[in-house]
A protein has these predicted regions:
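Extended, histidine- and acidic-residue-enriched regions that form the cofactor-binding/catalytic faces
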Residues: 6-129, 137-293
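Conserved SAM-binding loop
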Residues: 132
Length: 293
């Protein structure tokens, strides 16, 4: 599926037509950038993780999920919507999973520098809008640090977007999130029913349901004992995954189905496409200069 974010091209030009351009940054040719309507184009940087996800899921879960959400969004993007998806940054910030074999992680300062330098390269191409699309809960704070710095230094319009916070409704507006219990939404935060369902929809051959179970979280124990410490909002534990469950997973993975996962992916894809459309419609004065009173 192509996009239309070209300026008017000269007559008899060998440059591609708007509809012929791909959606992925790396698939463009260098001369294409000379005719991009860079003031409208939205660059999307997917950031994920390579980390353990219990005994039943592969290390690539977060990377697979963010790319699956993008794929689900593509059919809902208008050809008039100028969006370019940058290469997925698969390795992220995952120190909370380092006690489990296979986890790859970078230091916080490395991640900040990496994402910042990629954004600087995007800005050097003339693009003025950037979305940091994240699928890993352990690096949410780093997105905000990078986004605010880019706004302050480069004047970029930057949005931090976490795929797991996108609205979850079907085409009729009914809740897709209701497939899962409130308990699962709160405590099944890693390799539980939600992520396992999505992986069954995307890469079923990599899911070992024989090893999936209802993985208990010690977070539930604290919630039952402490009214403030356990409310999930007032205080945040600096945790390692084994603090929650020795298997490195929490939530009822045994209840996962591909059907639930497909519905989630479609809902996230629709929401992402709508979000990008809304960013495109923002007024030019969304970012403003300071003025003296």
């Amino acid at each position: 599926m192509g996009l239309k974010c070209l300026q008017n091209k000269p007559m008899n030009s060998d440059l591609p037509s708007a509809a012929a351009l791909p959606r992925y940054w790396a698939d463009l040719k260098s001369p294409d950038f000379a005719v991009l309507d860079s003031s409208r184009c939205i660059a999307v940087l997917p950031v994920a993780a390579i980390e353990q996800h219990g005994p039943h899921l592969p290390l690539n879960v977060d990377t697979t999920l963010v790319e699956g959400v993008i794929a689900a969004a593509l059919p809902h993007l208008s050809t008039d919507l100028p969006v370019l998806f940058l290469p997925t940054q698969a390795v992220g910030f995952s120190p909370e999973h380092t006690r489990f074999a296979g986890t790859l992680t970078l230091k916080a300062e490395t991640i900040i520098r990496l994402w910042t330098e990629l954004a600087e390269a995007v800005a050097a191409s003339g693009v003025k809008k950037l979305v940091l699309l994240n699928s890993h809960g352990g690096q949410v704070g780093l997105l905000d640090v990078v986004a605010r710095d880019l706004r302050a230094r480069l004047g970029l319009l930057v949005y931090s977007v976490n795929s797991f916070n996108l609205p979850l409704t079907d085409e009729q507006g009914a809740s897709v999130a209701s497939q899962f219990s409130a308990h699962e939404h709160r405590f099944g935060i890693h390799a539980g029913e939600i992520e396992t369902s999505m992986m069954l929809a995307l890469k079923p051959a990599q899911v070992d349901m024989a090893k999936a179970q209802n993985f208990h979280s010690t977070s539930q124990d604290r919630a039952e004992r402490f009214s403030i410490l356990g409310d999930g909002r007032s205080a945040k534990l600096a945790w390692q995954m084994q603090d929650y469950n020795a298997y490195g997973a929490v939530g009822n993975a045994a209840a996962a189905t591909a059907e639930k996962g497909h519905a989630l992916l479609q809902a996230m894809g629709r929401s992402l496409a709508q979000l990008l459309g809304e960013i495109d419609q923002l007024p030019p004065d969304t970012l403003r200069s300071a003025t003296a009173s």
